[in-house]
Amino acid sequence: MEAAKTESLNFINLGIVLNKKGEVLMIRRVKKEEGSGGAVLEWAFPGGKQRYDETREECAHREILDETGYDVKPIRQISLRIHPQILVTIVYHLCELNSEKQVAEPREPHEVAEIKWVKPEEVRNLITTDLDSKVAKTLGI
């Protein structure tokens, strides 16, 4: 089924992954993107485009595993918003780790240059665009 391999342009699912120390999982992109107001998007929460044959939670799980090698369980949706420039719906999921260690090698080195655990207060320094207010509240920042 070819449609199963095709990505949807409707949803981007991102994971807000916390470890036992309360640190947040972040990725540094290989290719920096230009955001609104000239901001350069380099660091992001792991995640990506939803395929037609998967749920939002399945997408978040797959993308986080592919980008970071961490196996996670999405436990609840934090926020949903429409991106103003590219007209996609961005869904933020709070995720817990199924294992504190990576269970696989990251499969997307062409997209992800670095994987890093950071303290919640460091997220604002890494995210150069507007941080979703519900995500900020969830992280306590």
Show the residue positions of the predicted features.
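Unchanged
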Residues: 48-73, 79-134
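A generic structural micro-feature
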Residues: 6-9, 37-42, 85-87, 107-112
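Conserved Nudix-box catalytic region and its N-terminal flanking loop in Nudix hydrolases
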Residues: 23-66
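Short, surface-exposed polybasic-and-hydrophobic patches located at secondary-structure transitions
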Residues: 134-141
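Conserved hydrophobic "DFG−1" position in protein kinase catalytic cores
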Residues: 17-18, 26, 95, 117
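Conserved beta-strand residues within beta-sheet cores
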Residues: 12-14, 71-74
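Conserved N-terminal beta-strand and adjoining loop/helix that marks the start
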Residues: 1-25, 46, 80
